[in-house]
Each structure stands twice: as C-alpha cells, then as structure tokens.
Amino acid sequence: MESSNLGGGGGGGGGGGPPPFLIKTYEMVEDAATNHVVSWGPGGASFVVWNPLDFSRDLLPKYFKHNNFSSFIRQLNTYGFRKIDPERWEFANEDFIRGHTHLLKNIHRRKPVHSHSLQNQINGPLAESERRELEEEINRLKYEKSILVADLQRQNQQQYVINWQMQAMEGRLVAMEQRQKNIVASLCEMLQRRGGAVSSSLLESDHFSKKRRVPKMDLFVDDCAAGEEQKVFQFQGIGTDAPAMPPVLPVTNGEAFDRVELSLVSLEKLFQRANDACTAAEEMYSHGHGGTEPSTAICPEEMNTAPMETGIDLQLPASLHPSSPNTGNAHLHLSTELTESPGFVQSPELPMAEIREDIHVTRYPTQADVNSEIASSTDTSQDGTSETEASHGPTNDVFWERFLTETPRSCLDESERQESPKDDVKAELGCNGFHHREKVDQITEQMGHLASAEQTLHT
C-alpha cells in the first residue's frame, strides 16, 4: 500500500509529486534488511549511515547507479538535508519523517544562486553588522598574533642565553679540570722535593737526641724550640696527610660550579701555605746544618758550660740541688769526673806577688785605713754580688750557688768535641774562668794575712 502510494506519487512527479531521489532514499532507509548499513535514527526524524563503505559498495549502485558517497551527500544538501551529529553520518530534514510519505512533496530542490545576485542580497542592512564582526575578529587576531610574536622573541632570547651559559659552563669545566691537574702535579712535585728534606731534618733531630746519651729531663720550657718543632710537625702532617680531593658533584646549575671553584681555590691556597712552610723548614734546616745549634732541649752539662751573658734561667735537677742530702756525693762525683776528663784545665794558684799586684797599693795605709779599706772592699764585693744576683734574677740563684760550691764538669766527650769545636771552646772557657767557693775563701784569707803584714810593716 505504501509502495503503491510512493509509485503513484512518483508517477505524478511531473504534476507536483516528490522527486525520485527522495523516493529512492526513503525506500533504501525503510528496508529492514539493510538496517546494519543504513536505518532510521531515534524518533524516525532522521536516518543514519552506519557503514559508509558497504553503503557505497552495495546500496548506492543498486538505487542510484553510482557508488560515490560524496556525490550522495551533495545531493542531500541540494534538497535541504543537514548533518545533525558530528560524530556520525546522520542526516535530517523537517519533511523527511518515517511513516509520513505525503510530506516528501514539500521537499524541493534548491536552485543554484549566482554570485551577482548573492552580492546584491548581501549589500543589504546585514553588511554593517557583518563588517563590524569581521573587524572585531581581525583586531582579535592581530592582538593574538602580537602576543605570539612576543612570546616567540622571548623564547629565542632565552634559548640564546641558555646556549651562552652552556658554553661558559663548558669553558669553566675545562678550566677546573686543568686546574685540578695542575694542583695534583704541583702537590706531587712538592712532596718529591720537600719529602727528603723533612725526613732528613727529622733524622738529624733524632741523631742529636741520641748522641747526648742523657736521660730526658724537663729542665725548663723553651717556647721557641717548641714552636719550631710544632711547625716541623705541622708541615709533616700537611705533607703526609693531605686532605683528599673533593668528590665530583653532578653539574646541574651554576652553584655547583661555584662550589667546585671555591674548593679548588682553597686547595691552591693550602698547597701554597704548605710550600711556604716547607721552604721555611728547609731554610731553617740549612741554617742549623751550617753551624747553628739546633733548637732542642739543653742537657745539664750545657747548663754548666753556658756563658754568663746568655741570661738563660737555669734550674738544676733535684738530685744536684745544694739543699739535697746528696750534695756531698754529687760534689765528689763531679770533682772526680772533672779531673778525669781530657778537657780539664786546672786553675793555677795565685802567688803572693800577683795578689799584691791585684790590690794596687799606692801607699802604706795606716791600721785604720787598712781596716776601712778591707771593710769597703768587703762591702763592694757584697754590693757587686747583690747587683749580679739582681741582674740575673732570682731564678739563677740555684745556678750561682752550684757554680760557687761545685766544680763544673765538661758535658762533651772527645768525639763530640771534634764534631762541635764551639762547644769545646765554651767548655774550656767555663773551666778556666770559674772557681769554686774554697778558692775564694782561700784568697780572702790570704788577703787578710797580707793586710796584717802590711800593718806590721807600716808600724
């Protein structure tokens, strides 16, 4: 019944019936056998082409004698169909509805519109509003273009800066590697040059301490010697226990490069200070080896042979102190060693003639004058002794008491005297220039006898 109506409508197409394209399209969509390819949409107000390939291969040749899907879509557009779903091929028209074939006659083919007639229609009242919209769109596009151009310039500038920073970092990395190699090379060279001098100086100090063959005693504190030994040991610590190189940090930014450069600069300064300290130690060692006495602890024998002008505060051990009970034994032992030592020179006894010449008597004084002169000489000697004691300070009283009560002995044996002639000269001067207290008392008694003899001759 429906097909007959469609046929009647098609037969009367010349008298205002629906076009054949619309009739064939309606029959194709209405066929239930092809619903998997094309079918009505939800509600029957549209149709959907589910499989365009099968539609072009099977249905179009059957109904329209061609297989061009695009041509079929253009035909739909000429009859006023529109695509209502962008995700699929679904088309609709207000008069193309399922079960309402009588509405197909209301669908007409659009006539082609020429460009001249279209321009004439556009030049109406819609031209101003459309122009304003276009101008706004143009201005918006220009603004967006300017933003994009500025962003592009900024990106190019950042890229240039990044490339420059990368080149600078590569140059700094190469310079740091070269500086690190130079530091390692200079350190190796310094250790090779200075290691022998330091070891020899340490061996020499050990040799000096062993050659004395005297037990170590803390007689006095020598700050200068302690400072020099500390310098030597500090230099040895720098040479042998040098700090390890800092670990290589991952190069991520400029801060890591700055930290590495600071560490390299600190290492360079450290090695420079070590080199200066090593040079100073070498100069000190060369001066000490050339004749200067090394700054080591002085033994008790050197205290005896030290000259009076040095002003060194000498302190005796408890075993040799005059107040100790072993003073007599020590005096006997010192006297025996002094007489048996090869460098001993006995002080000659002064004859009466020389004693008379020392007094420088220009006239024969009276008994009162002699007594006053003896008293004045005694006071003068006491004043001189007090001035000497005051000049040397209270710390040298023990030394002078030992010097006046005990016989000094030489601290150097024959082999040491051959190696250090200066010490021999000091020992001989000490032995020949100092007299013990018994000799002084004897001279005083002789002076008393001389005074009495002069008094007798004068009377």
UniProtKB/Swiss-Prot annotation:
SUPFAM superfamilies referenced in this protein's UniProt entry, alphabetically: Winged helix' DNA-binding domain (SSF46785)
Post-translational modification: Exhibits temperature-dependent phosphorylation.
Polar residues composition bias: residue spans: 364-388
Residue positions of motif Nuclear localization signal: 209-213
Extent of the signal sequence: none
SMART domains in UniProt: HSF
Keywords linked to the UniProt accession: Coiled coil, DNA-binding, Nucleus, Phosphoprotein, Stress response, Transcription, Transcription regulation
Region of interest called Hydrophobic repeat HR-A/B, as start-end residue ranges on this chain: 141-191
Gene Ontology biological process terms, A to Z: cellular response to heat; regulation of transcription by RNA polymerase II
Domain remark from Swiss-Prot or TrEMBL: The hydrophobic-rich region (HR-A/B) corresponds to the oligomerization domain. AHA motifs are transcriptional activator elements.
Protein name, entry field: Heat stress transcription factor A-4d
Record organism: Oryza sativa subsp. japonica (Rice)
Name of encoding gene: HSFA4D
